[in-house]
Regions:
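Acidic, small-residue rich beta-repeat scaffolds with periodic aromatic anchors
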Residues: 2-40, 125-197
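N-terminal "first-domain core" detector
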Residues: 12-81
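Acidic/hydrophobic-patterned starts of short beta strands in beta-sheet-rich repeat architectures
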Residues: 44-55, 111-124
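Short consensus segments that form the blades of beta-propeller domains
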Residues: 56-71, 96-100, 128-136
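Surface-exposed loop/turn elements that mediate protein-protein interactions on large endomembrane-trafficking
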Residues: 78-89, 145-152
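Solvent-exposed serine/threonine-rich low-complexity stretches and specific carbohydrate-binding patches
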Residues: 89-96
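Repeated scaffold domains used in trafficking and secretory/extracellular systems
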Residues: 102-107
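A short, structured loop/turn motif at beta-sheet edges
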Residues: 109-118, 146-152
Length: 197
């Protein structure tokens, strides 16, 4: 399983900004950094970790042949510093398009399971305004368990929590308005507390 392989390590140059560092080690040559590169002082016992999200597109394949369509993706990575300015690169997840390219709205930490560690939350949205008669965004939050042994993993473990499904916030083609309950990190954290986490 990929989640149990060792993570790749990369050297961060002296004085190199977090943006230049993650741009230099991007996973796909055509990838662009999406949003802000986050360098977090503390996540449980991990200090100065970096979170980066890369947007890219790939040609679609059907039955082994190109289908003439391009699909967009956003890949998330966690970079954990080790000794001598080296960083372990751990894959978070891929967020595929849902009618549009995923946009990472928020990266946050909250308790989402029964242990004391805070988990990683990633809130994504997808613009739906390109569909005739529809105006708004789809929202989905993803949770990932805190990696207790970072030297033995290459991918974060996702956590499923009931009640945090895809939600539409906007107006559908019948003119009906929907409001997403969980379209901000603050609302998600409040619900996690209500659930007893």
């Amino acid at each position: 399983m990929a989640g149990y392989c060792s993570a790749q390590t990369f050297q961060r140059n002296i004085g190199e900004s977090k943006e230049d560092f993650v741009k230099r080690i991007k996973p796909v040559q055509s990838a662009e950094i999406q949003g802000e590169v986050l360098e977090v002082k503390q996540w449980n016992n991990l200090a100065n970790s970096i979170f980066a999200f890369y947007e890219y597109s790939e040609e679609g394949i059907e039955k082994g042949k190109p289908n003439g369509l391009n699909y967009s993706y956003v890949d998330g990575y966690l970079l954990i510093p080790s000794e001598n300015n080296r960083y372990k690169k751990i894959f978070i997840d891929t967020y595929a398009e849902e009618g549009a390219t995923a946009y990472v709205e928020s990266v946050f930490f909250a308790n989402a399971d029964r242990d004391a560690d805070k988990e990683l939350g990633v809130l994504c949205s997808w613009d739906q305004s390109m569909h005739y008669g529809i105006s708004g965004r789809i929202y989905q939050v993803y949770f990932y368990d805190f990696p207790k042994a970072t030297d033995k993993i290459s991918k974060l473990k996702p956590i499923q929590i009931k009640g945090f499904d895809f939600e539409f916030d906007g107006t559908n083609d019948a003119g009906e308005r929907s409001v997403a309950k969980f379209n901000t990190a603050a609302k998600i954290k409040a619900e996690l507390k209500r659930l007893g986490f």
